[in-house]
Amino acid sequence: VKATLKTLAVCAALAVSGLTQAQDIKIANIVELSGPGTTAGTLFKNGVEMAIKEINASGGILGKKISYTTEDTQTNPGVAKGLTQKAVDNDVFAIFGPVYSGSIMVSMAESKRGETPNFTGGEAAAVTAQGNPYVFRTAFGQSISFPKLAKFINTKAKTLAVVYVNNDFGKGGRDTLTKLLEGTSTKIVADISTDAGQVDFSAAVLKAKQTDADAIFVYTNEEESARALREFRKQGVKKMLIGETTLTGQKVIELAGEAANGAMAHVGLTVDAPQFKAFGEKYKAEYKSESDHNGIKGYTGMYVLKAAIEKVGKLDRKAVAAAIRGSCFSTKQTPGILMDVCFDDKGDLDRESFLVEVKNGNPVINATLPALNARK
């Protein structure tokens, strides 16, 4: 009996070992599934999952399948840090999320400790200014997107009112734009702070309206952007409302309704661009809802990881992180990245982007802008 039990134990151990080998690329999704970041986190997670399903269906990476877990940060930086620590201790190969800048700023110390590649949707300039060699963006940081935005504002407005959310994301954008506009033809005439999760925008909108600025820059997270747009229209503001991706995303348009019409934004990722249309259709078929830039971030980030692992040719976290920094990846080599992309040594990415205006409830691309540091 003892021999039989021993044999069974050995067989069970081998079975578990075989299972681990078959699924030895472990990914942790650490995202905002509750709290103010629910929209961004859910779509980002869905994009990652969609890419994983596709990659596994086509044979995995280096013949290995991907397994993944999903955890909710509750849009809380402390929770995000604890979950990242847990993922590192569980020996995951890579981490996707958090999406919010305030959370990744706190949690990335743990992925650095574990030498674990960490893909984030966070856009605050400070995220990649910490010298963490394991953090990579899935969308523009403010140091890449805002110079393009500032050039556009210079051509449209002599005076500008700035409405921003008082968190790492909002303050980072406001500070970056302020510096870029110093000494230019555009003067900032109002600096209006709002709270994360703010419901009532009447006072902030009234302040902006009273400046009579040529244009108003709105830099808040998705749900707040929709509330702000509704209030601008309610107060009869006719001036140009300009922002970044979070002003004209699909969720914002759904929540703001007609109030979103006329809003303009510099957008790095949109399902309305030809490069992303097929992704948008696949996402809608899978999740019965529209994706926005967050879904594309998660999806393309997973394919960047795939391309980097294949470039290295082995499952070595440190080598894979090094293979992303200072490198370019093409759609010819890895179609799933959807658009050619280059990373610098800090983990910031650069690629083409778009100027979008909401017309009749749909984001319409007015112009395609080249990569900021386009390689000749």
Model-inferred region functions:
Residues 16-22:
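Sec/Tat signal peptide C-region and signal peptidase I cleavage site
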Residues 2-11, 22-376:
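Extracytosolic ligand-binding ectodomains
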